[in-house]
Amino acid sequence: MTKLRALRIGITIGLRSESESIWVNGIKQNALYLAKLFQHSPLGHSVMLVNTTTVALTDALPWDTKRFPARRFDDVKDALDVLIELGGQISDEQTRYLKARGTKLISYCCGPEYVQMIEAMIFRRVSGPVFINQQYDAIWVIPQVMETSAHFFSTLRRLPVREVPFVWDPMCLQASTRRLPFEGEYRPGGYANPRTGRRPKRLAVMEPNIDVLKFCLYPLLIAEQAFRIEGGDAIVHLHVTNADHLARHSPEFISIVKDLDIVRMGKASFVGRYDTPHFLSEHTDIVISHQWGLALNYFHFEVCWNGFAFIHNAHLCRELGYFYEGNDIETGVRQLLHAIRHHDNDWQGYRAKQRKAILRFLASNLGLISQYDELLADVCNP
């Protein structure tokens, strides 16, 4: 690695309110995890979060501001060696200012912007004018975004992209579950069916349902087929979150789900938005998931870290949970039935296995820290 000194690093956030929850989306979590990774570097980087909006920075921020300080752009624009634009975009004027003083500017792409942009165009979703910044020193793209958006970024921004590792940490999850039973970790519960000897399971589907990438329909079909095989003896209820608007206002959605056995027999509920840790702790034994072009997600790690059975098709973390390939619903059903019948036999071993598999993504992982220092060196010492 090219020799690198300690750097003053800023990571952008774009606050919309003074007490904005970190569970609104994954962006602020991403900024915190990346900041923690750089703080763990043996080089001793100085790291701060840089807010790009006019929202005031107060003690209402939902993280430890002594550990992860946040500042206004104008207050730190002369005190940065590197600015990583992650959660809030800077303007053309701000870009010119940083470039004039020699600050390196990195675009950290953690969203499927190609898909989001074409959906805005096709479905007239409000996006607003788009500022295409072509003055970056590097474009870093996380693995799950590469397939859909890498060439979109590189063409518009006139710079090759660099795939960078995905980073996570359980700190936000642990802060949220501290007061929950068993600190939010899975425990077998309920009464065993006297005929089968098994405890009926509570299923959950928690896709955002705001685009085609993470939608609830395939998980619903997996749950339906498993219900047809096992019935109420094995499945006590299915909750589908972020779906009340679909169940109330989408004729297409209603026409499909109304004839499902699990719906007709009153075993399914379509509810609103919930934060993941509390919903898992209070209402869930098994999570069923499906994605299309976004095969790594913090949600996957939150479910598995705390030991919940996870039926999914995310091939970039296929070692987690109970995996099925692509849209192979039959395998998804088999995996769900296996979890219903056998997960509780070794739930502690399962949780330990999940945490071991997630270690390679942690902000404290020495190999990951070294990779990011090498990435910084390539930008700062080309």
At which residue positions do the language-model features occur?
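N-terminal subdomain of nucleotide-sugar transferases
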Residues: 1-51, 223-233
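C-terminal alpha-helical cap of glycosyltransferases
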Residues: 359-382
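Donor nucleotide-activated moiety binding/catalytic core segment of transferases
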Residues: 244-306
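Short, flexible/disordered intra-domain loops and linkers
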Residues: 17-27, 116-123, 248-251, 320-325
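Conserved catalytic-core segment of nucleotide-activated headgroup transferases in glycan assembly
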Residues: 23, 27-30, 148-151, 158-267
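Extended catalytic core of nucleotide-activated donor transferases of GT-like folds
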Residues: 15-17, 31-150, 271-275
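A short, charged/proline- and glycine-enriched loop
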Residues: 2-15, 78-79, 194-203
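Catalytic binding pocket for nucleotide-activated donors in carbohydrate/polymer assembly enzymes
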Residues: 282-362
